[in-house]
Regions:
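Metabolite-binding pocket within alpha/beta catalytic cores that recognizes anionic/polar moieties
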Residues: 1-92
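Histidine- and/or cysteine-centered catalytic micro-motif in compact active-site loops
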Residues: 16, 50, 67-69, 123, ...
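Glycine- and other small-residue-rich loops at beta-strand/loop junctions that grip anionic moieties
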Residues: 21, 89, 93, 121-125, ...
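Electropositive phosphate-/nucleotide-binding environments in soluble metabolic enzymes
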Residues: 23-30, 94-102, 126-130
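Predominant activation on well-ordered alpha-helical scaffold segments within soluble catalytic domains
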Residues: 30-38, 101-105, 134-137
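Charged, glycine-interspersed solvent-exposed loop segments at helix/strand-loop junctions
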Residues: 88-108, 118-120
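Active-site glycine- and acidic-residue-rich loops that bind
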Residues: 93-94, 98, 127, 138-147
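Active-site/ligand-binding-proximal alpha/beta "capping" segment
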Residues: 106-142
């Protein structure tokens, strides 16, 4: 974790992440996010590579997430509640901040065609089967992947 100042804001930069398919438990995977929360960091910009299942996408497209579908059967909030982390049953209706997505859309206009999509998270490490890709499309996913 590296800290830099960008336009009078302290910014934390993290490189890489643990993946569920590497055998890490879900609590270890979310540890960096919880550290950032303890540091009172309220906003994250996270990137990953994903497979596009939306026929309107092309390889290399940059897509802002508007929602996700967790197909792993795991959730870091399962288990004893940690009150300091927030509510036991958090509202997930606006996980991907609409205001930030609008800013991204505005900024991207001069550089690339802005797209938004829904990400379906699979456990990996195998790539998704054709049936899984079809299922993901059927339930509303635009992207599939195994990144956490």
């Amino acid at each position: 974790m590296t800290f830099v100042e960008i336009k009078d804001k302290i910014t934390a930069i993290l490189s890489g992440r643990a993946h569920y398919y590497e055998g890490y438990n879900i609590q270890d995977i979310v540890l960096p996010t919880r550290v950032l929360s303890d540091l009172n960091i309220k906003n994250l910009i996270i990137t990953n590579a994903a497979g596009g299942v939306n026929s309107n996408y092309s390889p290399g497209d940059i897509v802002a997430l508007k929602d996700h579908i967790n197909l792993t059967g795991n959730n870091p909030l399962i288990g004893k509640n940690i009150d300091e982390l927030g509510p036991r049953f958090p509202d997930m209706s606006e996980v991907y901040n609409h205001k930030f997505r609008k800013i991204a859309e505005t900024v991207s206009k001069d550089f690339f065609d802005y797209k938004e999509g829904v990400y379906a998270w699979f456990t990996g490490p195998t790539y998704e089967t054709p049936a899984e890709v079809n299922f993901a499309k059927t339930i509303g996913a635009d992207l599939v992947g195994m990144s956490t």
